Every structure is written in structure tokens, then in C-alpha cells.
């Protein structure tokens, strides 16, 4: 046990050294809440709330062993992406998660360094890195590891940095000492539910993608967006932060991220709607090459911008 305590301490220190803002550990198979979250996902899928995101149906999510055979521990990390600044132009809105460089690559590179450190301490250890593209219950395991709780808007909330937090996980065959799982403390607050213009949060923790502005601007591949979405878009052309903007845990002073690669791109802060309408595909591809927003194809950007101009 002494060895596992020492290794746990070293792994956590290494994770903080790499710049993560929240670090916690969960033991596999986890508490009964993991079963609860897995069952909740199944009900969400059965209701069709994933819309066209068929990858959400992957059965691999149901069993952590599908990700790494013999997994015993999970290191969960959170990386603050909040920047205390606003876009100059108010005629378009872009979700904060896409302001800097692609967070998937940033988190993966940092976790690789933690994994290599683990290898030096335990040469026989096997490991796997999971970011939010993996068939893995990332929010549930973040909650299990104690770095935050799942809010009613379905984002993970940390008491220090709110919900402006990217998640990453390092699965390992090594036994590490677990932290206490986080307990949801949203209480009776339903500000996120009340603020959503399309009522996409149909009940606490249940987001219907068919009604969600983020889904439609990021994932909907139709040539035109539904009229009921267009009428409620405001100026959102890439994602949506409304439910996070109103969350009380995001109202207190949150420090700006110190991660250089998460500082806002110049075009994100300064371009106007008219600027973006003049961009050809080559300009879009150049601007998006290091961004998580490259998931939105140039034609989708134009569709989204046209849509906010059509709203009644």
C-alpha cells in the first residue's frame, strides 16, 4: 500500500507540473454512480437525444475494460480554458472552447508526458490516454475522480474554475489511491435550464441535441438549419456558451488560463461577420488548421452565418 501511495503522489505532482488545473484519481470499477451514469446514457440514447451523432451509441462506453484490458486506476485531469477577455465584434459569437488551439492535442501531449513518467516508475505498466473523442464516459469518471460534478447543463463543474474546463484521462493497469468522488451541489438552481433559448435542457442533466445550438452549429451536416433553431440562434455561429455563461459557478472570479496554446487566436477576437463572409475555403482551412473548430467545414460556417442573418 505504501508503494501505491507514493506512486499516486508522484503521478499527481507530475500532472500538476504539466499544467493541469484539476487532478484526481478513480479506482476501477468505480462506485455505484458509474453504473447510474451508464444507465443514464442508455436512456438518453434510447430517447434519440444524440440526434445524428451515431458514434455515441458505441457499446464500448459500457465497459471500461474495452478501453484498456486490466485497467485498475484512472487519472482524471482538468485544464482551465477560460480567458478574461471578450470578442471585439458582437455581431457573431463563438464558443470559448474553440478560441485557442485544438485542446485534444494539448491534453494528449501533456498526458503522454505523465504516462512516460509512469513508465519510468513502473516499467511494466500499461496505459491509455482518453480525451473526449474516445468511447469513454469522460464526465462520469471525472466526477468519480473528484475533479468536479456533472451540472444540470451536463458539463463538469469544478469549484475553483467553474465549467470552463477541458477533460482528459489516463487509464492505467497500476493500482493508485483513489480520491473521493465529487457530489453534485447545484441544489435547486436551474439557471442553465431557464436560460437555454431552445429549451434543449429538457430536464436536469438531459440535453436534447436536436434542440441544442451547439449541436446544430457544430455537428448538423444539413444544408439548411431548422427554422426553429435559426429563430433562436442569436449570434452563435460556432457552439454556444449560454448555459455556462449563466452558471453561478462561472460568475465568481475565475483566473485566466496560463496555457499559451489556449490563448485566443487573433481572428477569433477581431473578425466580424462581414470579414468571415468574404473568406474562401483556403482562408478557412488556413485559419482552422490548429483549431478544434476545424470540425465545422467552410460551407457550414457560411450556412451558420447566413442563418443568424435570417433569424426573425
Swiss-Prot record:
Binding site for [4Fe-4S] cluster 2: 196, 212, 240, 243
Broad class of enzyme this protein falls into: oxidoreductase
Active-site residues, record numbering mapped to chain: 132 (proton donor)
Molecular function GO labels: 4 iron, 4 sulfur cluster binding; epoxyqueuosine reductase activity; metal ion binding
Signal peptide: none
Subcellular locations according to the entry: Cytoplasm
Gene3D superfamilies: 3.30.70.20
Cofactor: cob(II)alamin; [4Fe-4S] cluster
Reaction catalysis annotation: epoxyqueuosine(34) in tRNA + AH2 = queuosine(34) in tRNA + A + H2O
PROSITE patterns assigned: 4FE4S_FER_1, 4FE4S_FER_2
Predominant place of localization: cytoplasm
Cofactor binding, per record: Binds 2 [4Fe-4S] clusters per monomer.
Subunit description: Monomer.
Protein role: Catalyzes the conversion of epoxyqueuosine (oQ) to queuosine (Q), which is a hypermodified base found in the wobble positions of tRNA(Asp), tRNA(Asn), tRNA(His) and tRNA(Tyr).
Protein name: Epoxyqueuosine reductase
Lineage: Bacteria, Bacillati, Cyanobacteriota, Cyanophyceae, Synechococcales
Gene field: queG
